[in-house]
Structures are given as C-alpha cells and as structure tokens.
Design a protein with these regions (language model features):
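Short gly/ser-rich loop at a beta-strand->alpha-helix junction or flexible surface loop bordering the NTP-binding
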Residues: 1-104, 138
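Surface segments flanking catalytic/ligand-binding clefts of nucleic-acid enzymes
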Residues: 80-204
Length: 204
C-alpha cells in the first residue's frame, strides 16, 4: 500500500480511482474504480509531474468501506500506529459523511480501533473478541514490580480476573525463542501476584 499501512491480505492488484465518465484502458494488475473524489480526499505526490493520490484519511475510509470488518480495523489501527492519521481525523471524516450509505459501518469500525494496538494480529483478535461479545481487555497492559521494573507487557489483560492474553504469529517470531521468553515472563508475572497468572496464547 502507498502509505505503508499493514495489511491482513496483500492486494492482488493496484487499485486506482478514475473520474466518473472518464475513458480508460484496461491494464493487467490494475483494478479501476469509477469515483469522483473531492479535493480534501486527494493530494499531489511526486516531483515536477506529480500524481494525485488519496490522502491517508481517505485511504483508511476507502478500505473501511470495501474490506471485511477485521481487515478494515487492522488498516485503521496501522494508520494510527504509524502516525499517518489520528482518531480525531477519522472521526471528523466519518461525521462529515452523516446520512450517506455505509456510515454506520464506518462508525462500527471506529468503535473497534485501538490507539495502543501493536500489531495486525492484535487487531484481528480484538475484532474476534468483539464479535463473540467478550469484554474488551486492556491493551498493552504492563506488569511491574514493587520497584517499578517492567516484568511483562501483555497484548490484552483483564486484571480483575488475573488473565493475560497473547497473540503471536509464527511468521513473526522464532517459536523456540518465543516459548522460552513467554515462560519466563509468565513465571515472573505469577510470582508478583503470589499465585498463578493465566496467559493463554492465540495464533493464526
């Protein structure tokens, strides 16, 4: 993707918007959409012969309108993680579409995004928890010693029931190193609370 947002599924083609009624030539690997964009949705990119591209905010909303829910949330989380957009910018853009088709879906996506999200897998798991009506845990929860030293940082945590939840993908981490590190972390966290601390793991 142009702006470097993390994706759940890599696109099979480059998607290009063209003005409604404009003629175009079909090209392999390019998917054309007929849609007229307003000036606030585009910006010029490049040197002496710039091309017009969708802004980061418009890109996030375009993905939100066309991708499955979990993919849309992952894109929005990634855009915020990279600092390309803010939640306020997305909220303002959605409010500007009040009364238009698809705005309820956009609001649903905004309700699921998380400024603290650290990865695509965390986005996917958060959506899955919401779809199964499981109370959302606290993201990137930090456990410290009495002296303030960080012992563990959980992807999700429910402190009131002493539960941490990690989501890891084998494509991102070496399994052996990950298991050893996770065991040490869980043991240290359990020691701090004087008993057992549940830390189930999920993967894709």
């Amino acid at each position: 993707m142009l702006w470097g947002f993390d994706l759940v599924v890599e696109p099979a083609a480059i998607e290009v918007h063209t003005a409604v009624g404009r003629t175009h030539v079909a090209m392999a690997g390019v998917l054309l959409h007929a849609r007229s964009l307003v000036d606030t949705e585009v910006r010029d990119l490049g040197g002496h012969r710039p091309i017009r591209v969708m802004t980061p905010v418009a890109t996030v909303l375009d993905c939100a309108a066309s991708r499955p829910l979990h993919e849309a949330v992952a894109v929005a989380d990634s855009a915020m993680r990279l600092g390309a957009v803010t939640l306020d910018q997305l909220t303002e853009a959605v409010q500007a579409r009040r009364g238009l088709p698809g705005v309820r879906r956009l609001r649903r996506i905004l309700a699921l995004v998380d400024l603290a999200c650290g990865s695509v897998l965390e986005s996917l798991l958060r959506v899955l928890l919401a779809q199964h009506e499981i109370a959302q845990g606290r993201s990137q929860y930090v456990i410290r010693t009495a002296g303030g030293q960080i012992v563990a940082r959980a992807d999700f945590a429910w402190p009131d029931v002493w539960l941490m939840l990690e989501c890891d993908g084998q494509r991102w981490r070496d399994p052996e190193d990950a298991r050893g590190r996770d065991r040490r972390r869980d043991n240290e966290a359990a020691g701090l609370v004087g008993g057992s601390c549940g830390s189930p793991g999920t993967t894709w």
